[in-house]
Amino acid sequence: MTKKKAFTPLLYLASIVFLPWWISLSLNKSLESWVTNWWNTRQSETFLNDIQEKSILEKFIELEELFLLDEMIKECPETHLQKLRMGIHKETIQLIKMYNEDPIHTILHFSTNIICFVILSGYSILGNEELLILNSWIQQFLYNLSDTIKAFSILLLTDLCIGFHSPHGWELMIGSVYKDFGFAHNDQIISGLVSTFPVILDTILKYWIFRYLNRVSPSLVVIYHSMND
């Protein structure tokens, strides 16, 4: 019975780790064809930003010029003019579908992440007992560590997350999350987040050390500051 009680939280922890990946993969496969079909056939308008509109217009003009040049070389007016119009029409549809891939991926990834969040939230509420057991294990593990090990762990974690060498790691992480939600890569937004988010984390950490650790373990704070200096 004791082994079963110990095994259940571990099984729950493993499911928490692998469940998001499985849900995301399943939803992406099941929703992709539906979202693509809905966007390409049901939308009355095509949503393009200024950069996309300019780019697609340039490609359309280039395509039209190539078709016209081809027809001038062939010199067969009526039949080939009709084929020209059909060819331009088909290529225009392909161009629009190509530029619609970005919003399709944005909708797909954003919807998938929202559904994953809702499912995991419900799963966490249902597994409240297992979470309490895991939390007690973590607290017991941390309690058994010496103050020196705790201070070293905090220092290592803070240097990794908000140290002078961390911006590149934050850039990769934020870019990955940004891409996971289906948004197009934007250097300005990512740079803005990289320059502000670690600062906010640093402030929260210092406040936590000042308010919580000073009260719970003053010796740990002294060791931490000594190692940090």
UniProtKB/Swiss-Prot annotation:
GO molecular function annotation: antiporter activity; proton transmembrane transporter activity
Example GO BP: potassium ion transport
Key words, A-Z: Antiport, Chloroplast, Hydrogen ion transport, Ion transport, Membrane, Plastid, Plastid inner membrane, Potassium, Potassium transport, Transmembrane, Transmembrane helix, Transport
Pfam families: CemA
Localization annotation: Plastid, Chloroplast inner membrane
Reaction equation(s) it catalyzes: K(+)(in) + H(+)(out) = K(+)(out) + H(+)(in)
InterPro entries assigned to the protein according to its UniProt record, in alphabetical order: CemA
The keyword Cell division appears for this protein: no
Principal cellular location given in the protein's record: plastid
Family statement drawn from the similarity comment of this UniProt entry: Belongs to the CemA family.
Function: Contributes to K(+)/H(+) antiport activity by supporting proton efflux to control proton extrusion and homeostasis in chloroplasts in a light-dependent manner to modulate photosynthesis. Prevents excessive induction of non-photochemical quenching (NPQ) under continuous-light conditions. Indirectly promotes efficient inorganic carbon uptake into chloroplasts.
Protein name per the record: Potassium/proton antiporter CemA
GN (gene name): cemA
